């Protein structure tokens, strides 16, 4: 999960985290 957060921006982190998870 850490590598995803580093690749995603703070704003996209919420959408990416909810979408991927």
From Swiss-Prot:
Keyword Amino-acid biosynthesis included in the entry's annotation: no
Membrane-spanning ranges: none
Enzyme class: isomerase
Keywords, alphabetical: Isomerase, Rotamase
Catalysed conversion reaction: [protein]-peptidylproline (omega=180) = [protein]-peptidylproline (omega=0)
Entry annotated with the keyword Isomerase: yes
Disordered: region residues: 1-21
GO molecular function: peptidyl-prolyl cis-trans isomerase activity
EC numbers for this chain: 5.2.1.8
Biological role: PPIases accelerate the folding of proteins. It catalyzes the cis-trans isomerization of proline imidic peptide bonds in oligopeptides.
Record family assignment: Belongs to the cyclophilin-type PPIase family. PPIase A subfamily.
Protein name from the UniProt record: Peptidyl-prolyl cis-trans isomerase
Organism: Naegleria fowleri
């Amino acid at each position: 999960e850490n590598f995803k957060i580093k690749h995603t921006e703070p704003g996209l982190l919420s959408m990416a985290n909810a979408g991927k998870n």
